[in-house]
Amino acid sequence: RDRLRSRGLGDVYKRQVIRLFPSRYIHIGGDEASRRHWKACPKCQKRMKEEGLKDESELQSYMIARIEKYLNDKGREIIGWDEILDGGLAPNATVMSWRGTEGGIAAARMGHYAIMTPESHCYLDHYQDDPETQPLAFGACIPIGQTYSYDPAPDSLGSDICKYILGVQGNVWAEYLPTYEHAEYMIYPRIIALAEVGWTPMENKHPESFKRRINNEIRYIRTKGYNPFTLSEQVQTSQTVDYAKKKIMLSLTSEKHPIDIRYTTDGSEPTVSSKL
């Protein structure tokens, strides 16, 4: 029953993790655990019955709470991915919210600290441009503008909730990154956008100013021997409709700066002499 303290995981944390990492926080994971093995395990089912646990989610939370108590007794605190919420949150745990923002917000509402790292904005191993033009990567496309647009602590949550949101984190998983140069290519410059997300209030963000600065930063990063992604020259369009004036306003932008965008309004192909 007390195997955690005498051997097994307790031994791993005591002899390896705690010795190697002097930090206050220890990340214990807790994500993507398939519970079908626990369903089929007689020992797991026996423990669930003994402890009055109604399902395997509660079994995971039971184990995480025991790990937390062990580490708290050693003067440490745990961080876990948002799945640790599923069967009930350990008393002092910090939640790292990756499956969207809901897990982090739920933890903050419960008075627990949260770190926001939603896959939709913070996963730097995902494509950053058209996959047809990029090295093999994981997941969907997350361009730098999407990362920059993220607001980890919106005013709508209220200050009583936002005070529990510690910040943001960028994640880079290396399955598709065989070299350091490839990792640099995926990390830079999106990590700079994420840094601004962490320290700049939403009302102080200026996308056009950031676009100018980030292009300068890319040039600087290259002078230091790194291998950053070159921002896309692809033109993005957005439109707004003024119903009162019966007009449609079309905006043409690009990640690249400076760049000349030429256009026509008669359906013909733009040329170097077309309007800017």
Question: Model-derived features: where do they sit?
Answer:
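Hydrophobic/aromatic-rich, well-ordered segments within soluble, folded domains that form packed cores
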Residues: 25, 30-33, 188, 258-268
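Single conserved hydrophobic/aromatic residue that forms the stacking wall/gate
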Residues: 2-9, 13
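Glycine- and acidic
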Residues: 11, 48-54, 172-177, 200
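Conserved alpha/beta catalytic core and glycan-binding cleft of carbohydrate-active enzymes
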Residues: 75, 80-91, 98-219
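Substrate-binding and catalytic surfaces of secreted/luminal carbohydrate-active proteins
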Residues: 16
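Gly/Pro-rich turn-and-neighbor structural signature
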Residues: 19-26, 30, 34-108
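Short, compositionally stereotyped local motifs that mark structural "simplifiers"
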Residues: 201, 205-276
